[in-house]
């Protein structure tokens, strides 16, 4: 019973940090032409790296006009996207090849 209670207490903490890979690195997964997680909270004023892991069999073009990023990522491949320090606010990104479903937001705080 103690293990079950501990699992319920720890699970939300583990999920909250799921996108954070290492200091300043955040992982985004493309699956079924959607970003997971769709929203990532990042610290304002710091450089960061997005590790975009495309788990779909087809390519996707990761793009943001808000923080000026663009990279084609082949199916089953990963790529690093460097992002300059951001001011506090919301910054949209999308998959240009599947714009109707591949949408996401960086929230800099």
Question: Can you say where each PLM-predicted feature lies in the sequence?
Answer:
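Asparagine-centered strand-capping/turn motif at beta-strand->loop junctions
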Residues: 52-54
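Short beta-strand/loop motifs in extracellular/secreted proteins, especially
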Residues: 48, 58-60, 102-104
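Beta-strand-rich interaction surfaces with strong enrichment in secreted/lumenal proteins
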Residues: 38-40, 68-72
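Positively charged n-region of N-terminal signal peptides that target proteins for export
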Residues: 1-9
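Extracellular/periplasmic metallocenter environments
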Residues: 27, 74-109
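Sec/Tat signal peptide C-region and signal peptidase I cleavage site
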Residues: 15-21
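N-terminal edge beta-strand
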Residues: 22-45
């Amino acid at each position: 019973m103690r293990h079950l209670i501990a699992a319920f207490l720890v699970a939300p903490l583990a999920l909250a940090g799921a996108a954070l890979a290492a200091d300043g690195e955040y992982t985004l997964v493309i699956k079924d032409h959607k970003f997971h997680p769709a929203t990532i909270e990042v610290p304002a004023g710091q450089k960061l790296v997005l590790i975009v892991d495309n788990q779909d069999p087809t390519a996707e073009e990761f793009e943001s006009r808000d923080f000026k990023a663009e990279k084609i990522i082949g199916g089953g491949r990963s790529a690093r996207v460097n992002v300059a320090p951001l001011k506090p606010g919301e910054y949209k990104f999308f998959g240009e090849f599947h714009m109707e479903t591949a949408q996401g937001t960086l929230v800099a705080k």
